[in-house]
């Protein structure tokens, strides 16, 4: 069939897709304006209640001691390169914490937002006796390199970072452990680079295509994801999150109902320290500024053997997503558990339960 005929036949579908994307983006930016108003009110309330803090965040001049805890591992930097031309590497430098080198397979940890490598402190201690555990600060999260441009945070580039990290550490595959944003990337990585992932452990994070499909039919999930709409706007999210010395971020971690139980002041500072440095909120928020670029996403079959752990009281993701994820799996490849009483922060709030499930799931790899 002549090319011009094919083009003509596809034209209505392409036009419909463009119109759909235009409609979606219009609704997204409308929701962004509403979210901006709500979060502005919240931030201003914090300022009025704590006037001495002012409208800006206080830069932390030195990291808390817990970030230098030697029992968690050695602090290293990896410059991302690939050894197979003509593929180009990003050349970015990523910070990571490593322990247990030579003790077994690579166990690579991917954190969520607003977190960093320190989110995996319990798992680094637990598994370093049998695995080479590596918790990375992902692109955009200081002290890893943080390009300012939104285009530097596309899914393709973020997946390349994971691939280059595995290869750069000298491995051909890994056990990929992830949470929140790290989980969203891990799902995609397992689809596009299945040979590099031996097993996956996911805590509270759905595949992007699944949450897109789920949210269309469950408006409650859209309300839970309200912050994503705010993050579509330039500069304002960074300003609001930093007001009253990062009170919105503090509340995220320490909220009586939805926060991390037992989080100490020093551990809270472990997360705030890097975010308090000039410009260090922009990289993490740029992840969200790319979320709607590829709408609509086509769901794909998931086949990597996966342990999925979900908090019963997760404030960010509805429990129904667990069943939705299961529908996209090859039968027999997914083991899922809902942890009673737990929320969004399972690796930090319920490490013992997580470790028990992980040891059982990985038992056959221990030899």
Curated annotation (Swiss-Prot):
Activation/inhibition comment: Inhibited by 1-(1-acetylpiperidin-4-yl)-3-(4-(trifl uoromethoxy)phenyl)urea (TPAU), 1-cyclohexyl-3-dodecylurea (CDU), 12-(3-adamantan-1-yl-ureido)-dodecanoic acid (AUDA), 1-((3S, 5S, 7S)-adamantan-1-yl)-3-(5-(2-(2-ethoxyethoxy) ethoxy)pentyl)urea (AEPU) and to a lesser extent by 8-(3-((3S, 5S, 7S)-adamantan-1-yl)ureido) octanoic acid (AUOA).
Q: In which tissues is it expressed?
A: Predominantly expressed in skin, esophagus, lung and tongue and to a lesser extent in pancreas and eye.
Q: Which Gene Ontology molecular-function terms are recorded?
A: epoxide hydrolase activity
| InterPro entries in the cross-refs | AB_hydrolase_1, AB_hydrolase_fold, Epox_hydrolase-like
Record-level GO cellular component terms:
endoplasmic reticulum; membrane
| Subcellular compartments | Microsome membrane
Please cite one Gene Ontology biological process associated with this protein: lipid metabolic process
State the similarity comment: Belongs to the AB hydrolase superfamily. Epoxide hydrolase family.
- PANTHER family in UniProt: EPOXIDE HYDROLASE
What's the protein name? Epoxide hydrolase 3
Organism, scientific name: Mus musculus
Lineage start: Eukaryota, Metazoa, Chordata, Craniata, Vertebrata
């Amino acid at each position: 069939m002549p090319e011009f005929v094919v083009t003509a036949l596809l034209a209505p579908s392409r036009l419909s897709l463009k119109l759909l994307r235009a409609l979606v983006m219009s609704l997204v930016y409308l929701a962004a304006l509403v979210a901006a108003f709500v979060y502005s009110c919240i931030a201003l309330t914090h300022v009025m209640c704590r006037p001495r803090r002012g409208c800006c965040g206080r830069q932390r001049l030195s990291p808390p001691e817990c970030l230098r805890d030697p029992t968690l591992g050695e602090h290293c930097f990896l410059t991302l390169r690939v050894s197979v031309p003509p593929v180009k590497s990003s050349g970015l430098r990523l910070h990571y914490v490593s322990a247990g080198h030579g003790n077994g397979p690579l166990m690579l940890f991917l954190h969520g937002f607003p977190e960093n490598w320190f989110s995996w402190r319990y798992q680094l201690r637990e598994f370093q006796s049998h695995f080479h555990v590596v918790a990375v600060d992902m692109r955009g999260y200081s002290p890893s390199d943080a390009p300012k441009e939104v285009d530097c945070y596309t899914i393709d580039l973020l997946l390349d970072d994971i691939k280059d990290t595995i290869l750069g550490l000298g491995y051909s595959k890994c056990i990929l452990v992830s949470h929140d944003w790290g989980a969203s990337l891990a799902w995609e990585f397992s689809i596009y680079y299945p040979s590099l992932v031996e097993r996956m452990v996911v805590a509270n994070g759905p595949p992007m295509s699944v949450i897109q499909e789920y949210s269309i039919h469950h408006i409650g999930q859209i309300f839970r994801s309200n912050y994503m709409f705010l993050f579509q706007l330039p500069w304002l999210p960074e300003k609001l999150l930093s007001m009253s010395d990062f009170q919105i971020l503090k509340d995220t971690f320490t909220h009586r109902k939805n926060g991390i139980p037992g989080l100490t002041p020093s551990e809270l500072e472990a997360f705030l320290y890097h975010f308090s440095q000039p410009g260090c909120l922009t990289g993490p928020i740029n992840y969200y500024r790319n979320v709607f670029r590829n709408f609509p996403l086509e769901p794909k079959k998931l086949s990597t053997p996966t342990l999925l752990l979900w908090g019963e009281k997760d404030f960010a993701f509805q429990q129904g997503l667990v069943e939705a994820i299961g529908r996209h799996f090859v039968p027999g490849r997914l083991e899922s558990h809902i942890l009673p009483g737990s929320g969004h922060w399972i690796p930090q709030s319920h490490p013992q339960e997580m470790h028990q499930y992980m040891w059982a799931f990985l038992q056959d790899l221990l030899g």
